[in-house]
Amino acid sequence: MPIVLLASSSIAYSQISNTEKDSLYINQIEEKKQPAKVLHAEPLYIDLIRDLGARKGEREWNLGLGLTDELTFDSYEALIEYEWAPMDRLGLEVELPFTFYSPLADNGGVETPSNRLNSIKIATQWSFFVNERIATSMAIGYINEFELSDFRNFGKPMISRNVYNPFLVVAKRWGNNFHSLVYTGPIIVHEYESGEVHTSYDVNTSFHYMIPGTRNFIGVEFNKTW
């Protein structure tokens, strides 16, 4: 019996410790001396411009690298991104994605694509609703992406098409550990050479769970396009 009581006490302590860690992490984000901000888990497929409820002075550099084997050549993707908040609740972003290609030895004479700066992407996001009491945030935003010609044909034309993407984000935290988020908006593609305009509509829904006592998340995302 004493052993059972001791084990029970140890488990209870561990649970309290993790709960306290979760609360401390949330309190660190939702500092009362600062403008209102709610901790939310962000999706991976969709890159938010800044945290929902961004505070003035926040800034961040991001670098990304990727490698894809295309059978006859390898493609290397590199991403440079800078995002910042010039004022409370307003986030801005500039992104430059590059793709570089390297032919393989046995490519059968297949022509390797030209290296390219894929696009220049500029974006803004305004958190128009942030409520710590109900742990809910909402934001509207706009992404404009100028897609460029590859380096071999650079300037002929320089901009091949324009992509317009207004969007809405709604996020809510349930208790300390459960998070949900919906990101949605139309994507309008304007082909400069043909003058054609194509429109699609995206919805990203995500559900995440913050592992107690850590800052790590596990979750699932659903991406739908019409």
Please identify what each model-predicted range represents.
Residues 1-18:
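Bacterial Sec-dependent N-terminal signal peptides
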Residues 15-226:
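Transmembrane beta-barrel domains of Gram-negative outer membranes and organellar outer membranes
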